[in-house]
Design a protein with these regions (language model features):
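Active-site residues of response regulator receiver
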Residues: 8, 52, 80
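Two-component/phosphorelay signaling modules centered on CheY-like receiver
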Residues: 11-29, 43
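Acidic catalytic/metal-coordinating carboxylates
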Residues: 32-36, 59-62
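Short amphipathic alpha-helix used as the core "switch/output" element in two-component signaling
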Residues: 39, 61-73, 90
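Active-site beta3 strand of CheY-like receiver
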Residues: 44-50
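Receiver (REC) domain active-site loop signature in two-component systems and cognate sites
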Residues: 55
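Flexible nucleotide-interacting loop at or near the entrance of a catalytic core
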Residues: 108-132
Length: 132
């Protein structure tokens, strides 16, 4: 299945997301803050990134901007317990694929990840067709 990076400073959230995603047969890697997450994400190989907004060292919106400057093809799903509509809109304007409020609902996470993977597959197919 997919390789997914979970970036969140709350271990309980990382563990919950890992359990949900691994149950769906995805491979999951974790990072405990935005800086560690950015380092892992820049190495590539991830199909989707799930990222918290409020984190130490590098917050989620800064993480998103830096990752988009490096690789704008990987879908990033932002997750926040402190999110407002303005925060969600800001994240989407900066390139986030989706925005989920904490505590995350299992169905909502799975739908967002599935949609992000579908988008990634469509982008890859489009790229392949353009090369022909």
């Amino acid at each position: 299945m997919a390789k997914i990076l979970v970036v969140d400073d709350e271990k309980a959230i990382r563990n919950a997301l890992r359990d949900i995603l691994e149950h769906e047969k995805h491979t999951v890697e974790e990072a405990e803050d935005g800086a560690a997450g950015l380092e892992k994400a820049k190495k590539g190989g991830f199909d989707v990134v799930l990222c918290d907004i409020k984190m130490p060292k590098l917050d989620g919106l800064e993480f998103l901007q830096k990752l988009m400057a490096h690789n704008d093809e990987v879908p990033v799903i932002m997750i926040s317990g402190h999110g407002t509509i303005d925060t969600a809109v800001d994240a989407l304007k900066k390139g986030a694929f989706d925005f989920i409020e904490k505590p995350p609902n299992i169905s909502r996470i799975l739908v967002a990840v599935r949609n992000a993977l579908d988008r990634g597959n469509l982008m890859q197919e489009t790229k392949t067709l353009r090369q022909k």
